[in-house]
Amino acid sequence: MATEVEKTESTPPHRILSIDALRGFDMFWIIGGGSFFEVLLGLTGWSIAPSLTTQLEHVEWEGFRFYDLIFPMFLFLVGCVLPYSLDKHRNSPKAVYVRILRRTLTLVLLGLVCNGLLDFHFSELRVAGVLQRIGICYGLAALICVHVGVRGQVMALISILLGYWAIMAWIPVPGGVAGDFTPQGNLCGYLDRNFLPGKIKKEYYGFGDNEGLLSTLPAVGTVLLGSLAGAWLKSGARPWWKVIGLAAAGLSSLALGQAWGMAFPIIKDRKSVV
């Protein structure tokens, strides 16, 4: 009879196929799936092809298209695996904190290297970036998940979203007016221009950085939303109840987001939608 150690070593780690499938779908678009589909649609000659191709481009400011959801989806997936990855080290608090810190610093450092850190032209260095945001959001959301349960995570998510909305809607920039969501007048851009180290480059929004300081808050909310979905998947609920629960939560979130968007415009660069 195999020993417990032998069983542990021979048993492959449990994979959540739904998370793996969604991650693969997301990575397909990240690595250039849009270009493939643009060519494919161009060959079809369909009358609807131009409209579909438009969905493979980022919206300039307000609103969103399909391509604007790819990076938020990745942050959501980062959150989905938190209930599984953190549980492995629940009995060793030190190991949990070391894991979180190591992953956060690794992602931030890799992002800086991708932005040209090793060129040592620090005045031209873009400090913000996609990997940096993933690392910081992972770190902050993971710390929240370590210290509070599902109810605490729900409260943290609500507090983050309402707090971000209140800050953006009620605090004006110097010389401006409260609730200005234009590219030039919003609070996120002002804080980036005045407090974000490094260079703010035109191709990353220009009046601020689309991965800047204040907009990190709702991005953390996206990771927490994923963590709640992961906790539901990890629960003892029956498979069909999990499907129904996720579908109901998704539809409710769409309706709530659409309604909230009437007062708080959906702007992907400012992360005013989770």
Q: What do these predicted ranges mean?
A:
Residues 2-91, 95-96:
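N-terminal signal-anchor module of multipass membrane proteins
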Residues 32-35, 108-117, 161-170, 250-261:
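Aromatic-anchored segments of alpha-helical transmembrane domains
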Residues 36-64, 116-124, 204, 255, ...:
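Juxtamembrane/transmembrane-helix boundary motifs at the membrane-water interface
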Residues 68-73, 86-115, 122-141, 145-164, ...:
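Transmembrane alpha-helical segments and their boundary/interface "anchor" motifs
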Residues 80-83, 137, 141, 145, ...:
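Hydrophobic transmembrane alpha-helices
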Residues 150-221:
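Long hydrophobic alpha-helical segments that form multi-pass transmembrane helix bundles
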Residues 207-256:
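A conserved active-site cap/scaffold subdomain adjacent to cofactor or substrate pockets
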Residues 273-274:
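Conserved small/polar residues in nucleotide/adenosyl-binding loops
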